[in-house]
């Protein structure tokens, strides 16, 4: 695994100094670049992020329902939110990518950026402990936690579309995967969404079937509200 430059600067940006800098190097390494890649750290970081944000929301909103808590958590930990955080940290400048990913602009790809954030969380946990992770994450999420509120704004596009159609006494939307491209670890899904009030199917594209369905549902809602 090639050493990554300027890691002390990244540590200052993250707000954490690693005792074992190799953990941070691994967290920034995509599987296209090395066998010592970040996917196991990503798995660990995903779980840690979920418990820290769940705990924060549970105590911040003592009267919120389970559904509202789940929707707020989903908003805060989903891939596009993590990708925004990655861009705030300029993680793309530090990623270790293979030649193919580098050439195709992998340092800008939201799924790779989001995965790197989760991997860094996992690396901090291994380098320190859960409480250190908690303190760090609450700092990263301070503004987002302050701004988030329970309610309809946290419902995802598929839920909003379903509720809209049910309220109009219309049939539920139908989703169909029409194309899957890419390697197993980095696929792109194309999904069509059909509703009775639109003559043509609406297409959504995403790094997972769920994300593609959400994208399609959001576009259907926009068309129905015109």
Swiss-Prot record:
It is an enzyme of class 3 (hydrolase). Keywords: Cytoplasm, Endonuclease, Hydrolase, Magnesium, Metal-binding, mRNA processing, Nuclease, RNA-binding, rRNA processing, rRNA-binding, tRNA processing. It catalyses: Endonucleolytic cleavage to 5'-phosphomonoester. Residues 7-129 form the RNase III domain. GO terms for molecular function: double-stranded RNA binding; metal ion binding; ribonuclease III activity; rRNA binding. Belongs to the ribonuclease III family. Digests double-stranded RNA. Involved in the processing of primary rRNA transcript to yield the immediate precursors to the large and small rRNAs (23S and 16S). Processes some mRNAs, and tRNAs when they are encoded in the rRNA operon. Processes pre-crRNA and tracrRNA of type II CRISPR loci if present in the organism. This is Ribonuclease 3. It comes from Shewanella amazonensis (strain ATCC BAA-1098 / SB2B). The gene is rnc.
């Amino acid at each position: 695994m090639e050493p990554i430059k300027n890691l002390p600067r990244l540590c200052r940006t993250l707000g954490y100094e690693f005792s074992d800098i190799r953990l941070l190097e691994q967290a920034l390494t995509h599987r296209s670049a090395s066998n010592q890649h970040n996917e196991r750290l990503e798995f660990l970081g995903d779980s840690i992020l979920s418990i820290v944000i769940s705990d924060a929301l549970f105590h911040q909103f003592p009267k919120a329902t389970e559904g509202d808590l789940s929707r707020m958590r989903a908003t805060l930990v989903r891939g596009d939110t993590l990708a925004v955080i990655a861009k705030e940290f300029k993680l793309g400048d530090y990623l270790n990518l293979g030649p193919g990913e580098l050439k195709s602009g992998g340092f800008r790809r939201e799924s790779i950026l989001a995965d790197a954030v989760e991997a860094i969380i996992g690396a901090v946990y291994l380098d320190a402990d859960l409480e250190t992770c908690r303190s760090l994450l609450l700092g990263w999420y301070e503004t987002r936690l302050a701004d988030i509120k329970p309610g309809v704004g946290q419902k995802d596009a598929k839920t909003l579309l379903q509720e809209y159609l049910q309220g109009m006494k219309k049939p539920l939307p139908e989703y169909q995967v029409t194309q899957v491209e890419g390697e197993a670890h980095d696929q792109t899904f194309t999904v069509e969404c059909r509703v009775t009030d639109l003559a043509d199917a609406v297409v959504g594209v995403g790094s997972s079937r769920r994300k593609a369905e959400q994208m399609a549902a959001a576009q259907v809602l926009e068309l129905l509200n015109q």
